[in-house]
């Protein structure tokens, strides 16, 4: 393929890259608009110099040392929200990492690495804890931007832009449109999105469309936030969406409708945002507003996955991480409060056996059956267990056998996936024959926990003597 271009045209593109495929309309955008850096502040943030030492998933940390939503706790906390990249996701989310910034980062800043030098680069500290928008420097897919509230730090893998609200939301609308990906291709054909390239993007501020764009972006943020917080991997998770229904089948159908409505509305929003910016930039002959389903970055209901997440929530209630009486995260370190749990009382020993047969009344299957009974009532118990068993699809002749086999064979694998190989429930396992397994909750682990596990094994062995 050959291009015939006047070399002077490239002078209008910031940095003058030789983008031979750029149309006249696209090139004119650099003349008609301002560079992104002239309208907001794109910044590189904190490079700790030792990710393994100073960065955690939020659920690994005790709530005593976390400052997630409480600015008052800032002076006493160790771990703070940290924008550090993540998977392709638009509008809101990927909020799962925290960084050690105790005492304004003194430990990070003064840390000496293996080479005998200070490895940290705490850049642009004046912007720490401000609200803004972040993007992943490296993506396996397209470019995407997420809004975040006050209280976050940011990194070189999750760089950020800052501006007053109206400008910020307008720019985020542009960055999550098809146009941003097109213009980024002029500077960088790869999937590595650095601060310099983002800074060069042309922003045409249209008075005609600014209000509509801000409203669409704000609504997209709300939808994406609702989606993100519907799962226990979010620190703003309150309760499982299946809890407030008469039975599990109805609960899933209601959840499925909610997911579909969110998905359709977000797709509609994104296509309207594309339509707006295509019109502003005059690219009707080059781009269409349509968005493929695969590029809508929120969840669509999946019966098996959702039943497994319900089971995971039940296990959280068994350990006292969650409660049927009080919403949100109840215990992940700190002071234990019996008054928050009501009738479904967490396991007192913090040891829940998983066995291939019913050796203990309080093994994981027994506790799970009690949980389902507590949530939906005794009258519908068998129907609910059958619904769960059918969704799981494990081996077994009865609903209880199928659910037991799921706990025995697959629950922990799924837990490792959910918590990205940093489990909050730890597994004691006697080996490949599944003779004995037990779960303990890391935030309730004490020096006595292993002794209790051994005692339970002895009780099981006595039944065979």
Range-by-range predicted roles:
Residues 1-117, 121-132, 140, 214-362:
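Polynucleotide-recognition surfaces of large bacterial nucleic-acid defense/processing enzymes
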Residues 78, 130, 156, 166, ...:
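Short, well-structured alpha-helical interface segments that form or flank functional binding sites
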Residues 85, 163, 203:
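Active-site donor-binding loop signature of nucleotide-sugar glycosyltransferases
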Residues 136-200, 208, 212-223:
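Basic, amphipathic alpha-helical recognition segments used for DNA target recognition
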Residues 171, 201-226, 252, 416, ...:
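Amphipathic alpha-helical segments
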Residues 177, 234-235, 246, 409, ...:
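Serine-centered coil/turn micro-motif
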Residues 265, 275-278, 282, 286-465:
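Terminal accessory regions of large proteins
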